[in-house]
Amino acid sequence: KSAPSGQLQLAPEGTVVTVREAADAMIAISDNTATDLLIDRLGRAAVEAEVAATGSSDVAALTPFLTTREFFLLGWGRPDGRAQWRDADVAERRQILAGLAERTIDSNPVDPAPADLDYVGIATRPATADGIGWYANGSDLCAALASLAVGPQNDVVRQILAQNPGGEFDPARWTYAGYKNGNAPGEVAGAWLLTDTAGQDWVISTQLASDTPIGPLDNAAAFELVTRSSSFL
């Protein structure tokens, strides 16, 4: 189980979750545990191969590909693994991740002070400079979403992505809106798949980041830039 956001981290051990249910939860409410279930089902190697296949500009920065649980433990666990991770090569990083397998996360602590994660630090201590996270530029995000739009079972993919459109788009201009966002301390990113009334697909991405300790960024304010700019496409 991972830390919030989401709901599946609160589900009892042994709860059966289908692939579709996990995908729905990952998109609809950014359920981190659902995301990790999908990574586990596919296998880390398959996810890393897909990163390369979509033409990522920096495959090395996404290798090994972290689960959200590993992300939290490395960046804000007690103890955290920032220094060890920062100085490690790929093989050493895989060993570090193997060492996290038995560690657990109390995703709903009664008192966050003695919890196994620094829950205050999650909101205030960015880990980007330590190499902890998922690295992509705007073109990478667009390429990944575009590959889903034309890939296998893209009709199902579109149904899933449409559960959270990430804003209000003019229905007179856009017949479809699908979306996925991501948040980390000091970072907000989002990508949209839009279809206009002529049937043309458009892919848009936005990213905001800071290396300094800041509080949670307002998604609505950040992504309003996209909904407003969509009228100019």
Predicted regions and their residues:
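Short, charged/polar low-complexity linear motifs in solvent-exposed/disordered segments
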Residues: 8-10, 52-55, 219-223
